[in-house]
């Protein structure tokens, strides 16, 4: 039997392209660094880094960015058996910069991303049964 995840996170997951220079708008950013992102996915990684068993449920596109996200989550110690590769929708992308006033500037790419197509009937119910705590990024069902 697999180990019992203590905390299960459900929600959006995306690739952030973060400006390599702060104080620049997206228009003026010279380059971007590819990072795993999405608040619920970040929570799952943080839980794992604190040494607590962590699992994640969500959708990614069946594309290179989706595979990148699963690899990053695995590397962080998050159980990823709850991630579904959606063959019909792409992984969400976000471009992020930190403006001079300290506020973040976002631009999202993908009008109908995979993470918005999480269906209750297609999720890994075993993860739900094994979780002590479940956190939701937003309401999907």
Predicted regions and their residues:
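Glycine-rich phosphate/adenosyl-contacting loop at the front of the ribokinase-like
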Residues: 1-79, 118-120, 135
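Conserved N-terminal subdomain of the carbohydrate kinase-like
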Residues: 53-138
């Amino acid at each position: 039997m697999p180990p019992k995840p203590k905390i299960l996170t459900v929600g959006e997951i995306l690739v952030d392209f973060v400006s390599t220079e702060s104080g620049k708008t997206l228009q003026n950013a010279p380059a971007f660094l590819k990072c795993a992102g999405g608040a619920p996915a970040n929570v799952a990684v943080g839980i794992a880094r604190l040494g607590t068993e962590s699992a994640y449920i969500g959708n990614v596109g069946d594309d290179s960015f989706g595979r990148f996200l699963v690899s990053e989550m695995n590397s962080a110690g998050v159980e990823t058996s709850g991630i579904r590769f959606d063959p019909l929708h792409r992984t969400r992308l976000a471009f992020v910069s930190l403006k001079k006033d300290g506020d973040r500037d976002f631009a999202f790419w993908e009008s109908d991303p995979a993470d918005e197509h999480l269906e209750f009937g297609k999720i890994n119910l075993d993860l739900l049964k094994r979780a002590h705590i479940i956190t939701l990024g937003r309401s999907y069902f």
